[in-house]
């Protein structure tokens, strides 16, 4: 049945964005097309083109919204109260894991491994602006404005990204390897923020990782 003869109720924006993310997870960023998104959203291509200037605008909106959602979730850190610096690092660890285990990130790692890195590292993109603002507000905001904060923010971003955008490609990750990976990242983040690498507060809390919450405990 053609797009013009199929009469269905239009989906909400949230439904279309979720369908876009599902299409990206299934087909990767280069192959996910309007037809895939429309099918998953139970609508037609006409509706998509009427509401978004082009497929790239839809993908940008969907992925940016998901990034903001994950970064918001990352701030909800369970466990005992930590010193401010250690808490900031734990928030970054949680954000890293949420991204690393996201199906869209997994698809991008398989099909376009450099695309996500470029999108977040390039200063002119909305994803970079979002990540940078989040880091300066919740991770490096205690540092003086100017070169010191900018240097630390860039160090945290470039240190965490390879972990966040390099998910396990084959099957579930071994729990021991996973814990070791996040301990290494934690140590590097301490150095980025000028904190002792052998911080006892963080060492105790990065020994166990919860698959249910996607966060270090």
Language model regions located:
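Hydrophobic alpha-helical connector segments
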Residues: 61, 74-104
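Short, basic, alpha-helical segments at the C-terminal edge of helix-turn-helix-like DNA-binding modules
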Residues: 64-72
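Hydrophobic/aromatic-rich alpha-helical bundle segments in the mid-to-C-terminal region
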Residues: 107, 141-189, 196-205, 209-210, ...
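Basic, helix-initiating cap at the start of DNA-binding domains
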Residues: 1-27, 31-40, 57, 68
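Amphipathic alpha-helical packing segments from all-alpha helical-bundle domains
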Residues: 71, 107, 116-144, 149-154
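Alpha-helical bundle regulatory/interaction domains
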Residues: 1, 62, 92-100, 122, ...
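Secondary-structure edge/capping motif, primarily at the C-terminal ends of alpha-helices
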Residues: 74-81, 109, 113-116, 163-171
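Short hydrophobic/aromatic patch on the recognition helix
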Residues: 41-52
